[in-house]
Amino acid sequence: MPTTATPRSPDPRPARTQAAIVAAVERLSARGDEVTVPAIAAEAGVSRSTFYAQFRDLDALAVRILTEVFTEIEALDLSLRASATPIETARATTSQLVAEFAKRRTLYAGVLGSRTTTEAHRAVRAAFAEQALGTMQLTVPAGLDPKVAAEYVAGGSLAVITAWLLSDAPEPIERVQQQLLSLLPAWLINDDTDTPS
C-alpha cells in the first residue's frame, strides 16, 4: 500500500538568519558604525559565508529590505486613502519612508550613494515605483500614465533622500519629509481644502 508523504514545512532557519542580519544592520546603523559584511556577520552572530548564502552583497540586502518597506508603505497609503485626506495620507507615508532611511542610514548611504554601481539604485527605484503604482492608478489625472507617474514620484523621492543620506550636514528628518511633501505633485496630495504644510 503506497504511503503518502507528509509535506515538509519550510525550513525556518533562513528566515531567522535573514532577520538576524537585518536586525544587525539596524543596530550598526543606530550606533553609527560602518555597515560592512564582516561587521554585519559579527553583529548577527553568523559567518560571512552564511551572509552570502542569504544575500549576494550589501546591495541585495538593501534592495530586499526596501522592497518590503515599500510594500508596507503602499498598503498604508491605500488604506488611508479610504478615510484620510490626501495630505494626511502623504504625511503618514513620507514619515514612514524617511524614518526607514534614517533607521538604516549607513547601509542606504553606502548602497545608494555608491559611485561604482547603479544596479542597486535602479532596483530600489523600480521597487518603489512598482509599489507606488496602485496609488497612481487611483490618483493620476486623466491623460497621465500611472506607470510614468509612479516612476516620477519614485525617482524624485529617491533623489531627495539620496542627497540627504550623502550630506555632510544632514537636515533633520522632519525637514526631509517636508521637502518630499512640497515636491509631490499637487494632484497627489491636495483635495479642495488642503495645501501642503
PLM regions with names:
Residues 92, 115-140, 144-151, 155-158:
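Amphipathic alpha-helical packing segments from all-alpha helical-bundle domains
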Residues 28-60:
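Helix-turn-helix
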Residues 16-27, 43, 60-80, 92, ...:
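Alpha-helical structural segments
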